[in-house]
Amino acid sequence: MATLTPKLASQIANIPYMVYQGIGDLELISKSLTRHFSFSESATIQGKTGGIPVLDSVPLLRKVIPGAMRTSEAFAVIGIGKGVYQDELVVSIRGTQNANDWITNFNIGYKGAPNGSIAHAGFINSFNSIKNQLKQHLSKNRTPKKIHCVGHSLGGALASLCADWLKSEYSYRVNLYTFGAPRVGLEQYAIKSGNRADKIFRCTHGGDPVPMIPLWPFVHAPYQGQEYRLDSSTKVCISAHAMSADGNPGYLNTASAEEWRALKTRANQYLHTPVRLKFEHRNQASFSEYWANKISAALITLLKDTLLLATVTAQAAISSGLTFYDLLSRHLEKVAKASKVREIQVRGLLGHMLVFAGKPVIAIEDMTASFIRKVFETVIGKLYRVAKQAILAVR
């Protein structure tokens, strides 16, 4: 049973975009792939993204609340393997491509994932909109030896959920391939997801903002595993999220290798590296993946130093979105008041966060929960704005 090559995986990840854009029919789109997989219009899956699921039955609200209704669009394709992939299937899920899709990422909250842990509610809702169609397509084919789940952007998040579901529901052998995918769930999700999939190939560009969100406590799978870093960029760049060959650099271009061992890998151990930031060094920070990771590590170090990590992690699993940052901000206010050492540590963290978000300060005297929450909102807002721009630029 073969693994998809980087080149083949990236080409397959691009197919749903071409279907979505109406570029020819699937037989023509996949002509260069016909040696390995057969695709057809009948194996196209419609999915709903964006909006608020409970409002699907109230069309009148489409006019009243712009973006509240979810849209149904060509969202995924299924390919039947041949040759070295005989008796295997591939499921390729596209990312978001319009503003309406992006409200999915603001469906703040958690839901139970197929692997029994907690994941992003918006991603779960989107996956649930295609699950029944996946079941129907699977019932039409004989039991596959393996299923390859592939996706870019939001499609990578859904491919991860799909892989977990296929393992839980059918006990199929599953490989997962993602390009520029966001974090899907909390720590336990990442651990279980990494343990369930037979192989995970997580591909990123250094400047792609989408894999940087959602922020901790969301964690990438495989937990403490590795990613395939396909370029050498460091600063956040909107174009770094592009899938297409005319992108800069474009995942189709950077994943053109025929073997995975030809690509650079990078370990994801930063969350477990102790980091204590000093306020006087804040201007070293920049809007980059390196500093996004370092700031997350500094926050976790602070919570470990104050014996709060277990408490905060538990609260993350039961409190949604901004409510979690309310709780976290109150914890940090108490920490700052506890001792001069902790006050210095909190101030250093906040100073670096503000510089990261493009809001440098000369001094920080206000250490209230209200101010700390505003700092979190500033950082989150900056990352989401840039990630949204990157998503809207995808073509």
State where each predicted segment sits.
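Alpha/beta hydrolase fold serine-hydrolase catalytic domain that processes acyl esters and thioesters
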Residues: 1-7, 20, 47, 63-146, ...
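Gly/Ala-rich beta-loop-alpha elbow adjacent to hydrolase catalytic centers
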Residues: 150-155, 159
